[in-house]
Structures are given as structure tokens and as C-alpha cells.
């Protein structure tokens, strides 16, 4: 029987400055910043939690033995889409109120479950952040 995944539990982003990045995601996207013990005598790690998901925030220069990770750790290389219950106009107003430049949108895009209305911006490392809501 083939293995089939059914959900994404967490992902890891590599960043230049954990404190700057986590504060941006907390302030702009309302994520909760948590510090956790990875076990094995390793240093504590920081994550961003929202809904039933989390993003582990890895310093791009962390030792690969200390933090087992992908072969290439480049800050600013992510392209992430987050879902919100807010309208695109509310997202635009929120981003503008916090001085975040809008790269594109609102625009219709194709999501995993249908048509999205998306607004794009960039996080402190330059990763592309898409904030979206599904059309009714």
C-alpha cells in the first residue's frame, strides 16, 4: 500500500535574525511565539504557532549538527501562503497600518481548495508572504 500524507505538521524557515522575524510574524500575522526544547541536549528553539500548525524559525547560520536541516539554508527564499478569515481589504489596511509594503493584490489566485483572494507582502528576510481568504 502506498504511503499518503494527509497534512502538514510544521515547516522550518531559515532567517537572518530570529527575534526580528518572530516579532514581525507576531505583529503582522498574529502568530504566537513559543520557545521549545528539541531534546537531546540541544539548545532551545523558537517557533511560530497558529491554528494547528507551526513554523520552526532557524537561524540561517545554525550548525547543521545542532539543527538537522535541509542542504541549503538561505534566508528569504520562502514563498508561503497563509489563510485568514479577514477580507482582502482588511488585510491591505492592516499591512498599511504597520508600514508593510504590498507587493501585489488583492488578486484572484488558485489555492488547494479553489479560488483565493490574495494579498502579497514580504517578511523581514524578503520571503514572499501571501495572505489569502477563500471566496464563498
Range-by-range predicted roles:
Residues 42-44, 76, 115:
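Exposed loop/turn and edge beta-strand positions of beta-sandwich/beta-sheet ligand-binding modules
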Residues 13-62:
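Core segments of cupin and vicinal oxygen chelate
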Residues 1-20, 78-80, 132-136:
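N-terminal beta-strand motif that seeds the catalytic metal site of vicinal oxygen chelate
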Residues 12, 32-39, 104-110, 136:
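Conserved catalytic-core motifs of GNAT/GCN5-like acyltransferases
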Residues 2-4, 83, 92-136:
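Vicinal oxygen chelate
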Residues 20-21, 87-92:
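Short, conserved charged micro-motifs
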Residues 45-46, 80, 119:
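Residue-level detector of beta-strand structural context in well-folded domains
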Amino acid at each position: 500500500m502506498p504511503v499518503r500524507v494527509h497534512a502538514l505538521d510544521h515547516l522550518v524557515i531559515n532567517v537572518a535574525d530570529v527575534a526580528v522575524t518572530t516579532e514581525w510574524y507576531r505583529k503582522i500575522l498574529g502568530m504566537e511565539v513559543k520557545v521549545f526544547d528539541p531534546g537531546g541536549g540541544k539548545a532551545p528553539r523558537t517557533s511560530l504557532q497558529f491554528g494547528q500548525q507551526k513554523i520552526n524559525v532557524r537561524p540561517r547560520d545554525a550548525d547543521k549538527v545542532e539543527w538537522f536541516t535541509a542542504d541549503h539554508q538561505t534566508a528569504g527564499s520562502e514563498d508561503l501562503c497563509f489563510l485568514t478569515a479577514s477580507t482582502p481589504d482588511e488585510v491591505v489596511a492592516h499591512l498599511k497600518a504597520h508600514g508593510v509594503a504590498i507587493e501585489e493584490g488583492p488578486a484572484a489566485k488558485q489555492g488547494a481548495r479553489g479560488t483565493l483572494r490574495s494579498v502579497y507582502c514580504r517578511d523581514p528576510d524578503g520571503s514572499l508572504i501571501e495572505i489569502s481568504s477563500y471566496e464563498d
